[in-house]
Amino acid sequence: MHRPHLPHALALSIAFALALAAPASHAERSGAAPAAQEAVQDESRRLNAWFDEKFAEELRFSPIALTVLGRKELYDQLDDVSDEAAERQLAWRRATVEEMESRFDYDALDEEARLSWDLWKQQYELAAVRHRFRRNAYVFNQMQGVQSFLPTFLINFHKVESEADFQAYLSRLAALRKGFGTLLERARRNAEDGYRMPRFAYEGVLAEARAVVSGAPFDEGPDSALWADLQAKADGLAKAGTIDAARAETLKSQAREALLAHVAPAYRELIAWAEADLVNAQENPAGVGSTQPEGAEYYRAMLRLHTSTDLDPAQIHRIGLEEVERIHREMHAVMERVGFEGSLQDFFAYIASDPKFRFPDTDEGRQAYI
């Protein structure tokens, strides 16, 4: 229940798993000495088997990841979003790296196994950085918020092929309220300590949260997305002959109760907090580097985490200003060349609105665009 996209750790692990499936290494293809080649292959096979074990262990931390992969273990649960769970998972990652380094010889691996080693170790290092700055990352936000992710996840990934699957869905709705409570308490604490979203992010969260609990059974409007999904999945069981029509109606009644008992209060508590704290949010903050505790350190860490550059934030900012200045110079040169009089903003509006700068909305225009 972390994000509206594939959980970060899972995405990295899938990339890691793909590396395990990579073609044979250069040493294997080039006809290296048989004994040496066999030793490399043996060590690489041992490591890859170990990776398979650890990946299976890692998935146990995330019922959501298991479901995304099409598996039904822990199907009635959501991820534990408590601080204690995060500490346990980070400790597990650290222990796996220590075990890997003590049990295997990096220099005795083939090229692909070394890449897998590097990726596994990098996953731990990235997780450690994220954990170090976990308070700086917004608990709810308009881009990757749990308030939009969980309904999307349940609708798109929680398949119902039996009554047990349907009951697991309802259990997840109950777990949603508990998870929201944990996250909301963290968001409150963070905001009080200066880790607060900008106003537009609050507004985005509010819009998304309100949308989830708009419509039946929450109000008199058309069916909400979750309610429509639950009804369709109950009817699907009846259509498949798994249950009869009467049982499907019973399941729908249970689903309606779960939405009102768990989802409605969870979202309304989030909405109430966001509405109340909105007045404290800055309209257009300068950025986390200057508005958050340890913001400058967090910004530098995120630069290293998301890019391959060693430049510091000040250098990158300077490059940005220089690039804006360069582009403006080039645009002014174009304005002068075409004889346009007015400001740069006027020129942008002129280009955007004058039909002569647009391809016609025809097959010929589309072909010309291509």
State what each model feature region is.
Residues 1-11:
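Bacterial N-terminal signal peptides that target proteins for export
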Residues 28-370:
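N-terminal maturation segment of proteins
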Residues 21-27:
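N-terminal signal peptide c-region/cleavage motif recognized by signal peptidases
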Residues 9-21:
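Bacterial N-terminal signal peptides
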